[in-house]
Amino acid sequence: MLLWAAVGCLVSTAGYAQKIKGSDTCLPLTQQEAENYMARHPESRVTVTGGGSGVGISALQEGTTDIAMASRKIKFDERAKLVEKGKKPKEVVIAYDALAVVLHPSNPVTALTREQLEGIFTGKITNWKEVGGANLKIVAYSRETSSGTYEFFKESVLKNKNYKSGILSMPATGAIIQSVSQTPGAIGYVGLAYLNRDVKAAHVSYDGGRRYVEPSLAHAKDKTYPIVRPLFYYYEAANEAKVKPFIDYILSDEGQATVKKTGYIPVR
């Protein structure tokens, strides 16, 4: 999966070769949608690669991708740079995603409040015994600064406080899963679609511990799980005729069924 994501997934849109780049959160979904789309339009080809939301938007600015995948909204300066280059960026929400907090399976801690998560990732809480766990050093994993997931977690969970100095930054979501699964004191955060049996997802409370909610598609859809965000595609308006068939497919009933099947929340 990680190697495939790194080198790109060559699949094929109607009659066009297309490049899609950016968010690792969007990557598994876009790969699957592209495979399904190619099956319907074998004359087309789409190349899908990850790297992070910032990487995708930078590629859109430089004209090296047709669609930028992002797990956050485009920033003012990113939009301004596109406009400076004579490009008019357009935005579409293709799905929603929940962020799960993941722990090593051996960790006796099963639930954390937002305030505890803030303390852990800002460095104020350094040992699991401080949140009801064993006397074990906390090893916190994060995404890199170019990641939209990094920025969304900072905004939603840390309330825009800075991550602690020396936090272990991973280049891709899969690397967080792998690292947490191999480190008893570890904690990290990943998109819901990346959850597997190698890690344990913590229940999360945003009301001071009165109610803890398990990260799941059902809880994300009914809005009882608090860490949910939209997933975006950005493209240049002048390129709309080229990218619209693929985007329309993702927003169709068939495409949205794939959204749900792949572990994301449909837009409707």
State the predicted function of each range.
Residues M1-S12:
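Bacterial N-terminal signal peptides
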Residues Y16-R268:
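Exported/periplasmic ABC-transporter solute-binding proteins
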